Amino acid sequence: MSAIRPEEISSLIKERIANFKSEIEVVDVGTVIQVGDGIARVHGLEKAMQGELLEFQNGVMGMVLNLEEDNVGVVIMGPFRDIKEGDTVKRTGRVMEVPVGEALLGRVVNPLGQPIDGQGPIANNGFRPIESPAPGVMARKSVHEPLQTGIKAIDAMIPVGRGQRELIIGDRQTGKTAVALDTIINQKGKDMICIYVAIGQKQSTVANIVETLRKAGALEYTIIVSATASDPAPMLYLAPYTGVTMAEYFMYKGGHVLCVYDDLSKQAAAYREMSLLLRRPPGREAYPGDVFYLHSRLLERAAKLSDDLGAGSITALPFIETQAGDISAYIPTNVISITDGQIFLETDLFNAGQRPAVNTGLSVSRVGGSAQIKAMKKVAGPLKLELAQYRELAAFAQFGSDLDKATQARLTRGERLMEIMKQGQFDPMPVEKQVASIYSATRGFLDDIPVAEVRRFEKEMLSFLDSNKPQLLEHIRTTKDLPDEKEFNAAIEEFKKGFSVTR
């Protein structure tokens, strides 16, 4: 064995000393002084900012919501059972961010952007903070492009445009989710990205929705953000912001996005739970004072951007669940005042077989005709008027049997219009067929058809036009206007002659 020379050792030690770099990582560290119910109070983080992410000793993340004199109130984003008093908490200096990008399409993620569908990790195009300012006045453009839902009652009377916020409100089990799923399925081939945010739903329900969209071929352009009923309140609170953040990535690239929040009542309840645990003063219905801002800052991020910014859009369909049809409660009135209209679904109509159960009297779109094609505007005008007159007369007709001919004719027409507004679930209809269907009803072609036969008449008439007079439907599709009325009437008359009423 060769002997080690002392000069070699000394030169080696000198080299090591010269190359030594002392790296000191300075972090703000605080101590947990109280923990429970998903909330922790942390002492010693005076420099923490509102909305900042903190890291607990066991790796679980938390978000600062309360800044108090001697401690900060933190909501915990994960299991809080292992966190105990005396644990250390580090500041990260970062706010909450989620991954964005095309790779998220077709995937199911939680509000932190982590995949929960068992299909492996997701490559992303970077991260965006979940709280970002809404586009300003000059960055916006008025809503003028229709977003076809494929549902006759909505596209004709309560039209939705790209960049609009349209509230869907109703009791539980009135078909709110069905309306949203039909709308998502109808966006196939229309260059739209869809984001479905499930807030406080059962896991089985979310699994059914994923399967429904997959079967319809709609999952490939849809992202599902799911905060289920078993998730902690902060996850339910974050889910809608995660959804709109992912949507903004596409909007600012000039894309068009449909964002469905199902439903915001559960988000408000989760926020109320967090606020009460953080000892914030309660207001009406025990909601905190800033519950209006909770929803307004979310829904204001839906916009139609100006041409200078790429003319992209986010259309928001927020859901609110009412109790026994009470739309004058706190959260419903808040969201009605924030949105550009509401679609009111009614239990009585649903139980009477009128599905989708849209109450056309209480529903409204504040964008209106500017979100409709010319042909639909022409046929929808008489439809709204006739249905309003029918509703008025139907109330009186219950009391008296002696009705004059004009009143009887109105009631007859109204019954058939109500029947033609019915539609099967997951069966969205292209706009040209909607126009043909409503045209036949408002022009009196159905007046002598029994109500029970109206749906069959409609189905067979549309397939007749498809196979024998495709140029009429093609004209509506391409020019967005009605074809020559004489030709249209003659085609419907020709079909009607061959239509046999079953006795």
Curated annotation (Swiss-Prot):
UniProt KW ATP-binding keyword: yes
Membrane topology: Peripheral membrane protein
Pfam families, per database record: ATP-synt_ab (PF00006), ATP-synt_ab_C (PF00306), ATP-synt_ab_N (PF02874)
InterPro entries the UniProt entry points to: ATP_synth_asu-like_sf, ATP_synth_asu_C, ATP_synth_asu_C_sf, ATP_synth_F1_a_nt-bd_dom, ATP_synth_F1_asu, ATPase_a/bsu_AS, ATPase_F1/V1/A1_a/bsu_N, ATPase_F1/V1/A1_a/bsu_N_sf
Binding site for ATP: 170-177
Enzyme class at the top of the EC tree: translocase
EC numbers: 7.1.2.2
Site feature: Required for activity: 363
Function: Produces ATP from ADP in the presence of a proton gradient across the membrane. The alpha chain is a regulatory subunit.
NCBIfam families for this protein: atpA, PRK13343.1
Quaternary structure note: F-type ATPases have 2 components, CF(1) - the catalytic core - and CF(0) - the membrane proton channel. CF(1) has five subunits: alpha(3), beta(3), gamma(1), delta(1), epsilon(1). CF(0) has three main subunits: a(1), b(2) and c(9-12). The alpha and beta chains form an alternating ring which encloses part of the gamma chain. CF(1) is attached to CF(0) by a central stalk formed by the gamma and epsilon chains, while a peripheral stalk is formed by the delta and b chains.
Entry protein name: ATP synthase subunit alpha
Source organism of this protein record: Brevibacillus brevis (strain 47 / JCM 6285 / NBRC 100599)
Encoding gene, per UniProt annotation: atpA
